[in-house]
Amino acid sequence: MLDISGLSSPPSRALSHLSGESTIRPDTLANDVNGHKEFDAQLDSAKDLADIFEVVKRVVRKSTGKERSGLMLGLANLGGGPQGFVGAFYPVATNIIVMNSLPLRRIKETDPVLYKPYVFHILLHEYLHTLGIIDEAATRQNAYEISVKLFGKEHPVSQFAADLSRFVPKLMYPVYGWQPDQGYTLELVEGFDRSSTASYIS
């Protein structure tokens, strides 16, 4: 696992394992003021985890032109300890993201204003993994670039991407392919990735 508790600046520039370059399209690199307002409003109006994920998909599609359908989200108490805890992980070659319910609950109870930005960042990070970005540094860098581009540098989403330890000091990013040592019980989130479901039906 990669402990980010000492990180004090935006992730250093990293390369995608697929192309050797950032996955952000060159034509989207300039700050988009209208985009800031659009996606900020969408995130603000999101009512649940599924809504937040739909914003994640739109943001990634606008920034990279890439998307993936048919994903599921499972919630599980993955625990935590003195060394820290994992926010979420993506089991390799699956269609599910597993999110740790423990920090979700704590953030909702202690600082609910940060709940949506936290969820967005965690889902964005794992969604980028599902798109084939395996390297952790590359994933973090792409998440930061996308966040700044479409939310602005000062937005909580971008602040999470720049230095998550400011808000959740003991949260760690697991290495790609990480699995918890012990078994866990999954609670699947209903209606997740609803836009891809709708496209299959229509």
Enumerate the language-model features and the residues they cover.
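An acidic, glycine-rich, mixed-charge low-complexity segment common to nucleic-acid enzymes
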Residues: 1-9, 14
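Long, positively charged low-complexity segments
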Residues: 11-29
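Metalloprotease/metallohydrolase-associated module, dominated by Zn2+-dependent proteases
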Residues: 9-12, 30-108, 134-202
